[in-house]
Amino acid sequence: MQFVAFERAKQGTGASRRLRISGKAPGIVYGGSAEPQLIEIDHNALWHALKKEAFHSSILDMELNGQVTKVLLRDVQYHPFKQQVLHVDFQRVDEKTRVHLKVPLHFEGVEGSQAVKVEGCTVTPLIHELDVMCMPAQLPEFIKVDLSGLTSKSTMGLQSVKLPHGVKAVVRGSNKNPALVSIKLPEVVADATAAAAPAAAPAKKGKK
């Protein structure tokens, strides 16, 4: 995806406020060997771009002063109640340096799985994006998770996902295989399963 940015000469609260009134959004691009650069972007164009998933999770082409620079979206500040972007941060991308980014997970095939189609389970995603690290050229816009083989007894953890070549998941904490979805049986089936469980043997009375 490509967007157009312009150099911003002034900074500060007052200058940023005047910029927003004129229909522009203030921002900054940093990283790499160049100095941080203040920029401004047409607010409407930026607002519509931010609605697209790929704008958040892929390498972008930023056109500035007739030159195109590869960047990543790093931070967006929104107004608390207006539909307005207050500030946006981009980071320059070095093609020889690994990038660390959150990539969306696309869950596919769940409606045709045995868990849903036959057993009537409710399948709920627990994780919607994944921290990954890879070279810029290998960064995927999203990662597909195939749920077509799910049953009510399935477990779907991170290690069940086939990551694209060169992409490594970054997992924090001791659990290296976090669950990606929860699988819940219909209440009627769950109640029947519980009722069919053998009752606990009564405790023996002590001798008098």
Swiss-Prot record:
It comes from the Bacteria. It holds the Pfam family Ribosomal_TL5_C. Gene3D superfamilies: Ribosomal protein L25, beta domain, Ribosomal Protein L25, Chain P. One of its GO terms (molecular function) is structural constituent of ribosome. Disulfide bonds: none annotated. One of its GO terms (biological process) is translation. The keyword rRNA-binding applies. CDD domains: Ribosomal_L25_TL5_CTC. Keywords: Ribonucleoprotein, Ribosomal protein, RNA-binding, rRNA-binding. GO terms for cellular component: cytosolic large ribosomal subunit. The keyword Ribonucleoprotein applies. Part of the 50S ribosomal subunit; part of the 5S rRNA/L5/L18/L25 subcomplex. Contacts the 5S rRNA. Binds to the 5S rRNA independently of L5 and L18. PANTHER family: RIBOSOMAL PROTEIN L25/GLN-TRNA SYNTHETASE, ANTI-CODON-BINDING DOMAIN-CONTAINING PROTEIN, RIBOSOMAL PROTEIN L25_GLN-TRNA SYNTHETASE, ANTI-CODON-BINDING DOMAIN-CONTAINING PROTEIN. Belongs to the bacterial ribosomal protein bL25 family. CTC subfamily. This is one of the proteins that binds to the 5S RNA in the ribosome where it forms part of the central protuberance. This is Large ribosomal subunit protein bL25. The gene is rplY.
